[in-house]
UniProtKB/Swiss-Prot annotation:
Disulfide bonding pattern of the chain: none
UniProtKB keywords: Magnesium, Metal-binding, Transferase
Cofactor entry: Mg(2+)
InterPro entries the record matches: UPP_synth-like, UPP_synth-like_CS, UPP_synth-like_sf
UniProt protein name: Isoprenyl transferase
Positions of the catalytic residues: D38, N86 (proton acceptor)
Gene name in the database record: uppS
Subunit description: Homodimer.
Cofactor note: Binds 2 magnesium ions per subunit.
Organism the protein comes from: Bacillus thuringiensis subsp. konkukian (strain 97-27)
Role: Catalyzes the condensation of isopentenyl diphosphate (IPP) with allylic pyrophosphates generating different type of terpenoids.
Length: 258
């Protein structure tokens, strides 16, 4: 079932936010939270600003939410940063988006290291500009020994492309005698995906009011709980994330059972 905002905190304004955080942490925290960060352009348009201003503001929110997810002991935070379809956007906007990882990591990497955060990337990295790829590679190298939150960027990522690539690699291994047809299973296909070393997302969040998945982790979200909000990504706060997790904690996850 899909929900929008869950008014759990209504009437609790006299309770400190830190206390609410501690109460939520007593419950089950999703191991893997995936977020479709949507609405940067519309946020900027409403303020008569260029779309890139929305992306810049959204970058600041990534910093804030990453630190908060780490505080909540979330194990994996996957952020849909740039899809394989986003190349269709105006060149000026795409060029700016390709500079954002460099800017983001240039200022935030020391904090990520201090917070014990490990940076990872999924997506077709070979098509990224050299400066973008180098910024991501540097961050991954410098945080690879960290054991805290895994900050996983989906950059030039498309789920259908990922699944096709997985099947191609599986067929190649079959031709080389490494895989037998009778061995093919869900677990085997999962092992060929870019997320093979990560647990599937338990909670998927999408901002901006759009109610669609947009080719994001289609295989991995088979049993994820969805949480939608009308809030644009630049306005997304720690309270919104806490609200989503609280909603998650109040749902009954049956995985096809009763």
């Amino acid at each position: 079932m899909m929900f929008k905002n869950f008014p759990f905190f209504k009437g609790k304004k006299d309770t400190s936010f830190d206390h609410l955080v501690e109460e939520v942490k007593k419950g089950y925290i999703p191991e893997h939270i995936a977020i479709i960060m949507d609405g940067n352009g519309r946020w900027a348009k409403r303020r008569a600003m260029p779309r890139i201003a929305g992306h810049h503001e959204g970058m600041q929110v990534v910093k804030k939410i990453t630190k908060f997810a780490s505080k909540l002991n979330v194990k994996v935070l996957t952020l849909y940063a740039f899809s394989t379809e986003n190349w269709k956007r105006p060149k000026k906007e795409v060029d700016y988006l390709m500079k954002l990882p460099e800017e983001f990591l240039g200022t935030f990497l020391p904090e990520l290291i201090e917070e014990n955060v490990q940076v990872r990337v999924i997506g077709q990295q070979d098509r990224l500009p050299t400066h973008t790829r180098r910024a991501m590679e540097k961050a991954m190298e410098e945080t690879k020994e960290n054991t805290g939150l895994i900050l996983n960027f989906a950059l030039n990522y498309g789920s259908r492309d990922e699944i096709v690539s997985a099947v191609q690699h599986m067929m190649k291994d079959s031709e080389e005698g490494k895989v037998r047809v009778e061995d093919v299973s869900e677990e085997m296909l999962s092992s060929y995906l870019m997320t093979s070393s990560l647990p599937d997302p338990e909670l998927l969040i999408r901002t901006s009011g759009e109610l669609r998945i947009s080719n994001f982790m289609l295989w991995q979200i088979a049993y994820s709980e969805f949480w939608f909000t009308d809030v644009y990504w630049p306005d997304f706060t720690e309270e919104h994330l806490l609200n989503a997790i609280t909603d998650f904690q109040h749902r009954g996850r049956r995985f096809g059972g009763v």
